[in-house]
Amino acid sequence: HPGETMAQWWMEGALEWLLDPTNAQSRALLERCTFFVVPNMNPDGSRRGHLRTNAAGRNLNREWAAPAMDAAPEVFVVREAMAREGVDFFLDVHGDESLPYCFIAGVEGLSGWDESSQAQLDFYKNRLADLNPDFQTAVGYPPKAPGEANLTMAGGHVGHHFGCLAMTLEMPFKDTTATPEPAVGWNGPRSKALAHSCLLAVGDYFDSNVSQ
């Protein structure tokens, strides 16, 4: 969503971390993992100052079930690339206007969700909380009941079609309740730092038994 600019700061931090030639941790991760990165899913919406839609007026995170090239070309081409390359891990980065927390929403509503799926989600969330005190696991969206996943959303579509850990990361617009910084609130440097932690947690996830 183009109005959720904290996601752009997160992405800038992620790219800086991954591409830093002096970072031994990122070099080790890149030896094992190939990252396919979409820096901005909605450049037209960003350029036009939209909150949630692209130039055609479509909310792209409700177009993943059957995107059309004339309405949601951004989703269409990314879905095609995913089908061609495959997906083993997926993180969709957003901001939430109402909840003053950093949290992750999983896709528990998928019909095939099982104990293994839950263990993967729990491992990643808990590891991220260990790495970064700005992230927490106590507050977030309530999980959907089995069979009620929204497959028009990126996480639901990817989790359903690729059977991988698929998540949505949400960050606050103003500040975090548990770790507030009143002088700056939730800002670019904190978004970047969270990106670094997310990537470290990716490596730990693939090192763990739960990712198998």
Outline where the language-model segments fall.
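Active-site/substrate-binding loop(s) of hydrolase catalytic cores
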Residues: 1-151, 156-184
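His/Asp/Glu-rich mid-to-C-terminal helical/loop segments that flank catalytic regions of hydrolases
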Residues: 176-212
